[in-house]
Regions:
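Short beta-strand/loop segment that forms part of the nucleotide-sugar
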Residues: 30-39, 59-64, 88-89
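A conserved acidic beta->alpha catalytic loop
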Residues: 22, 37-47, 64
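Short, acidic, metal-binding catalytic loop of nucleotide-sugar glycosyltransferases
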Residues: 21-30
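Short aromatic/hydrophobic "clamp" motif used to bind/position activated sugar donors
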Residues: 84
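Donor-binding/catalytic cores of nucleotide-activated saccharide
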Residues: 68-69, 89-194, 204-215
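Catalytic core of nucleotide-sugar-dependent glycosyltransferases
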Residues: 200-206, 213-240, 253-280
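Glycine-rich, basic loop-to-helix element that forms the pyrophosphate-binding segment
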Residues: 63-79
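Membrane-interface aromatic/basic loop that binds lipid-linked glycans or pyrophosphate carriers
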Residues: 261-327
Length: 327
């Protein structure tokens, strides 16, 4: 068996058929599709069963709801492929996505290959075309790019992994933003990280914005980056400065949202004290030139004005994305 495609599923009946239909035409007898029903209460299981009746290389796993990480782990444990691919059940693939990544992995001896992707909105697609050509990074290069979340993206979907690597490292159960706990570990086990910039994955953007999905569980992302910082301190000491900045950037972005929501503002203020106690010396050492950090320590009352300036800059940066209308 060459490739196992793992699809975690929970209450996505509205999108699941499009996801599974996108696999048509790119499967052969050397591939298997593992559909992990994570305790869905809608019509998702019936859609899975209908798909499995038409495709003999499909396995359905039924389990109690345990979250995305637990569902991925369940699929990974039974996967027979030499490579594993994670496809989220509300997203979908371009034709030949799987074989494109597989061919590149074999040709370039890559343990992981990342494909390009679209941000898929209802009426249009967005594509970041900053990476112009395919490339192979070594372990150190890939880790630095992951820390900066630039050419190596901090997500698990849309990448082809050699199975022996991911089977060693399970996803953390019960965590939001599970990738922040996991990606650096598998990249560390990767001598050759391939990047194919061609957009092969459609990453569905729901209508609910960050304010609508924001909660205290958003701190899981910060805690994942805290674990990553400790990992970087142990294995990649030359990258501590970049990782400290990444941790600070992440917390600052979440704090900016929390400040607008009374339910969460104090909790994030309290967590800032925890972070500052743990990493204050590193912040002082590596963030001395970061204006946001200096403002937060000295003139916190003017942070809203500075946030406004940052939002303007963010819009300018996002204008570099290629927009493709669907109507």
């Amino acid at each position: 068996m060459l490739i196992s495609i793992i699809v975690p599923i929970y209450n996505v009946q509205e999108y699941l058929s499009q996801c599974l239909d996108s696999l048509e035409g790119q499967l052969d007898t050397n591939m298997e599709v593992i559909l992990v029903n994570d305790g869905a209460t809608d019509n998702s299981l019936a859609i899975c069963e209908e798909y499995a009746q038409k495709h003999s290389n499909t396995i359905i796993i039924n389990k109690e709801n345990g979250g995305l990480s637990d569902a991925r782990n369940a699929g990974t444990m039974v996967a027979q492929g030499n490579y594993i691919y994670y496809l989220d059940s509300d997203d979908w693939l371009a034709p030949d996505a799987i074989l494109t990544l597989y061919d590149y992995a074999v040709k370039n001896s890559c343990e992981i290959v990342q494909g390009g992707f679209y941000y898929a909105y209802e009426d249009y697609l967005l594509y970041d075309n900053s990476i112009k050509t395919a490339q192979v990074l070594n372990r150190e290069e890939a880790m630095l790019e992951l820390i900066k979340n630039e050419s190596v993206k901090d997500f698990s979907w849309g990448k082809l992994y050699r199975a022996d690597i991911v089977k060693k490292h399970i996803f953390p159960k019960g965590k939001y933003f599970e990738d922040s706990y996991w990606q650096h570990i598998v990249v560390h086990d990767c001598a050759h990280y391939g990047i194919v910039p061609t957009p092969l994955y459609y990453y569905r953007q729901r209508s609910t914005g960050i304010s609508g999905t924001f909660s205290l569980k958003s701190l899981d992302l910060v805690q994942g980056y805290e674990e990553r910082l400790e990992f970087i301190k142990g294995y990649y000491s030359n990258y501590i400065a970049e990782m400290v900045l990444s941790l600070w950037d992440t917390f600052y972005s979440l704090m900016s949202v929390a400040n607008k929501q009374e339910d969460y503002k104090k909790a994030f203020e309290d967590y800032w004290e925890v972070l500052n106690e743990k990493y204050g010396s590193l912040f002082e050492k590596y963030l001395s030139s970061d204006l946001r950090f200096r403002i937060r320590k000295t003139y916190p009352s003017i942070l809203p004005l500075y946030d406004f300036i940052l939002r303007i800059k963010s819009r300018i940066k996002s204008s570099n994305l290629v927009k493709i209308s669907l109507k």
